[in-house]
Amino acid sequence: MSSTYGENLHLTIFGQSHSPAIGVTVEGIPAGEDVDRDELQRFLDRRAPGKNVWSTPRKEADAPEILSGLVNGYTCGAPLTAIIRNTNTRSQDYANLAVTPRPGHADYTAEVKYDGYQDRAGGGHFSGRLTAPRCIVGGICLQILAREGITLVSRIASIAGITDEGELTGSLAGKEFPIVSDARGEEMREAIAQAREAGDSVGGVIECAIFGAPAGLGDPMFGGMENRIASAVFGIPAVKGIEFGAGFGVASLRGSEDNDAFTVENGKIVTETNHCGGILGGITNGMPIVFRAAFKPTPSIAREQQSVNLQTMVPEKMAVTGRHDPCIVPRAVPCVEAAAAIAVYDAYLSRKREMR
């Protein structure tokens, strides 16, 4: 399985949704970086399940056990390994998946890829549960980046077609349900509640902005900043699309409208607009990096759906049991921040080496 990411940071995710523990090993974090464990736990709590009405009923503390790489609160240069114990699993809910794959899940493709040897319980290694160890590394990267003057802020841009209003600002940082318009937020929550009541689910879009990233991060072609961020973000289950800056909207603009005019502000080169999302030619230009990620509705729903019995090759109806989110978007916000932080810090380390 491809569970490793990074050029300077090398992180490997391990475990399954219902295994005794899930975890991560990361190499490449320089020695001497201060890790605030309380701040890290607060970040992980934003992703943790079972804490609100729009989340799965599965309750997990998501308290990380750091086994190596940290001494007296500082990174020591050795590989950092951390685990999170799985304490609230119900594998019996997935007994029927051995022969009947769930629509919208990786059950069928995993069956083909791994000849039936994959762990099916809770989605195994394909589960969104595996975003928790990624958030450990992302949370640490966020702390390091903040000390370098680089901050990340995200919001729920839309849920079930209900779009937030206003501009993304730092005031939303760390909020459980980060939206600008309280009225639109209530509409989103109501849409989630209605989907849950109907045994269904809804998706949405998360917008993320990275402030303070210096010009010069990233490379042309395959090492571009968009490539790095997209690769990390697509590692989050349920992500089906990503766009930077004005995104697909640029296709309807003229060049004179899309081009971000350069100017000088306080002795620094800036652009008057930011249609490019802070990236030109794969390299950051010093403006905020802005992107949006689209999340599909949670595929585990209680409504009856059609599948196929893989033993008899006969179509049959099924309804998914177990505990699942009617909307994954609110809990996915810190996952997007973690992915972006890892990608940006990895590129930041590359730039530091280039400038030596």
Show where each model-derived region lies:
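Alpha-helical support elements that line or immediately flank enzyme active sites
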Residues: 20-32, 128-150, 223-231, 287-297, ...
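Glycine-rich anion/phosphate-binding loop at the beta-strand->alpha-helix junction
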Residues: 14, 20, 199-202, 206-315
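Glycine-rich, mobile lid/loop segments that gate access to catalytic sites or pores
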Residues: 113-221
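Short acidic, glycine/tyrosine-flanked loop/strand segments centered on an H-E-D-like triad
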Residues: 98-124, 306-324
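A short glycine/serine-rich beta->alpha loop
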Residues: 10-15, 118-130, 215-219, 276-279, ...
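Glycine-rich, N-terminal phosphate-binding loop and its surrounding beta-alpha-beta segment
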Residues: 44-103, 107-109
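Internal helix-turn-beta structural module
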Residues: 10, 300-356
